[in-house]
Amino acid sequence: MRGRIEKEIQEKEGLLQDIEMVADLKVMPLEHHKKTLVRADHISLRYGGSEEPVFEDLSFELCRDDRLFLRGVNGCGKSSLLKALLWQAGYGSPAQGDNPDLFIEKGSLYTAPGLVISYVSQDTSFLKGNIRDFCRKRGLDESLFCAVLRQLDLDRIQFGKNMETYSEGQKKKVLIAAGILTPAHLYIWDEPLNYIDVFSRMQIEQLILRHRPAMLAVEHDERFQETVGTGFVDIGSAASVG
């Protein structure tokens, strides 16, 4: 899989030099007055009704210039940590179907006061209706939103269709475009590149490297991690930033 992706990257690297875009993709990070945006001190997470914790004794700090990736085997609690952080910052349940009984059993999870978060969910099943209604609910400029989707190679013909008819890759592009256009202190992305084509991945990489927003993300693409990340948080062993 990785070999195929690397081959596609090599074949398409020249395209970024040759294609004249209407406008560069832009992200609009906000600058928080606090240096530390998130700090976990020896936290353990547990779901209500479960005898075993999701994970134990996790510590890390995320500052304004950090782009940290969560690492660990499937089921170790990466997405659960993102949900706990969102709830701690006052964002409630980020997507439908989440277990509301997740709680911090031990330790403390700090989020900076007034922290504004832009969240890209792993789940796309809640996307319904048309783009106009989606933009209205999210407070997004529809013209700018559609321009970003075009830059991510979503065909204009899709703009008039209901999003539940979109492919998984097209739905991901909707969430990424919304995430990009939402000004925030911290960008939380949960497996954003699932089903995303290589050319769009390269554009997203360049976007992050240009604007360097603070990020906490889960992503299995090692090349993407190494290109845009500043560190890692390993979950499953008394974790720390590396």
Residue ranges of predicted features:
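ABC ATP-binding cassette signature C-motif
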Residues: 32-242
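Coupling and communication elements adjacent to P-loop NTPase active sites across diverse families
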Residues: 1-50, 63
